[in-house]
Amino acid sequence: MMTQWPSPAKLNLFLYITGQRADGYHTLQTLFQFVDYGDTISIEPRQDGEIHLLTPVDDVASEDNLIVRAARLLVQAAANSGRLPEHYGADIGVEKRLPMGGGLGGGSSNAATVLVALNHLWGCGFSQDELATLGLTLGADVPVFVRGHAAFAEGVGEILTPVDPPEKWYLIAHPGVSIPTPVIFNDPELPRNTPVRSIETLLKCEFGNDCEVIARKRFRKVDAALSWLLEYAPSRLTGTGSCVFAEFDTESAARQVLEQAPEWLHGFVARGMNTSPLQQTILAQTEFR
């Protein structure tokens, strides 16, 4: 039987770069929150040990796709620990709604959903901590999606502290460009020395994103999108872009602004969620097993 699993988007409500390690990775402080909008992963268990991706992505080999990599990672970890069932395998499809290179965490969210869903469907019995550790090998943002709760992240994004920021309404806009993360992080003008602050201090300050100045300088459409949004509400870049978002207290206020969006700017309205749709789904599945 085909099962459906949410793969939600995330926003970085703030993002500050606090340094750069000897290995090149940047240290940061960021606040992750989920929204009630994203991709949908479809999974039908198989009995023959095969992993099939039903919806390949253009220009990405199936074996390089994060969905397939996540499934194979779980197979290997389960086999190594004696938790792999005798009959396993899966047909996996994805209905994409999140843009690639948009800063919404689409690929990381897909990987996390596959780890969580297959662990449940195959009965592997990995804990959330174990799945998060596996997920970190796929990408720095995967653990927060596995854990499924809004979080303050430090280090290179792997040190997570659960938090509960206000669940506002957001107008999230895609300016029609894709920004590879290295383009931003390799820019020599990227701020890399923002002072480390406590979460208590950060929550009292106006939120910002150190990557925004670079994205606006290098991508004209990102600059134009933010300039337009800032006329209506507090707005900023999410992640390294390219998506930008504005925050509102009500859904109707967000939708009124979306209706006025220029033709070249595509967007949607979503509610902030401190417990992700994936976490809600797995809790419901566990409760009614």
Curated annotation (Swiss-Prot):
It comes from Enterobacter sp. (strain 638). This is 4-diphosphocytidyl-2-C-methyl-D-erythritol kinase. It catalyses: 4-CDP-2-C-methyl-D-erythritol + ATP = 4-CDP-2-C-methyl-D-erythritol 2-phosphate + ADP + H(+). Catalyzes the phosphorylation of the position 2 hydroxy group of 4-diphosphocytidyl-2C-methyl-D-erythritol. GO terms for biological process: isopentenyl diphosphate biosynthetic process, methylerythritol 4-phosphate pathway; terpenoid biosynthetic process. Homodimer. Pfam families: GHMP_kinases_C (PF08544), GHMP_kinases_N (PF00288). The active site is at 10, 141.
